[in-house]
C-alpha cells in the first residue's frame, strides 16, 4: 500500500464515522472526575478537520508524483 492509498483509506474512515456521528440522536459522552460531558460536537469537528487534513495530504502527495 502506498502513502496515497493509506491516506485515502483514513479519509474514508473519517467520512464513515462522520455519517454515524452526524445522524440524528447520536451523542458521544466522556466521563471525567467532574462528571459526564457531551463531546459530540467536538468529535464531529475533529473528524471534519482530520478528513480535510487527509485530503490536503493526498493532494500534496499527488503533486509530488
What are these regions (language model features)?
Residues 13, 19-64:
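Short, charge-rich amphipathic interface segments used for partner binding and complex assembly
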Residues 1-16:
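Short, charge/polar-rich alpha-helical segments
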